[in-house]
């Protein structure tokens, strides 16, 4: 009993001090998707890419390197350097201009007149460089996802 009375305050102090330290926030890879695709005169695509931060802390994104594959065609490279601070469990966008292949442009044109009834599958994958809130150095996070885009009714050359 005497031994318990002597060490109990020390144990309680240890538990209290352990609870006072900063909690480590969980860090998860982001999701990247096409928020909007606009066809510019001359055939260039203007992509609005959404970067979704799935982590419990802010992430400071600085670059993206990956590929976009449309309708099982040959993928095209995506690369962008930028500065984007995305809060925890939130998303933000970057804009990127790319020159699609002829086959990609034809696949997109095939669904243009169908409005929201037509859709085109795509796959986007690669890595994004970001610095998590509680870390000193940026690191690379892999991402991969598939989705569909379709023409926006009444807005020519725009797909979501």
Predicted regions, residues:
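Bacterial N-terminal signal peptides that target proteins for export
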Residues: 1-8
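C-terminal motif of bacterial Sec signal peptides marking the signal peptidase cleavage site
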Residues: 16-19
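Post-signal-peptide N-terminal segment of Sec-exported extracytoplasmic proteins
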Residues: 27, 39-79, 130, 134-141
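Intrinsically disordered, low-complexity Pro/Gly/Ser/Thr-rich segments with frequent PxxP/GP/PP motifs
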Residues: 71-107
């Amino acid at each position: 009993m005497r031994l318990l009375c002597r060490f109990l305050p020390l144990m309680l102090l240890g538990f209290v001090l352990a609870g006072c330290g900063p909690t480590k926030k969980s860090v998860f890879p982001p999701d990247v998707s096409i928020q909007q695709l606009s066809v510019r005169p001359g055939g260039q695509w203007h992509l609005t890419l959404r970067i979704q931060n799935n982590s419990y802390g802010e992430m400071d994104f600085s670059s993206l390197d990956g590929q976009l594959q449309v309708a099982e065609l040959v993928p095209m490279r995506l690369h962008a350097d930028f500065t984007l601070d995305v809060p925890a469990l939130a998303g933000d966008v970057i804009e990127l201009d790319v020159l699609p292949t002829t086959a990609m442009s034809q696949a997109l044109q095939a669904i243009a007149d169908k409005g929201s009834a037509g859709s085109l599958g795509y796959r986007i994958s690669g890595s994004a460089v970001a610095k998590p809130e509680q870390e000193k150095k940026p690191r690379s996070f892999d991402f991969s996802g598939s989705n569909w885009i379709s023409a926006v009714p009444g807005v020519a050359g725009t797909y979501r």
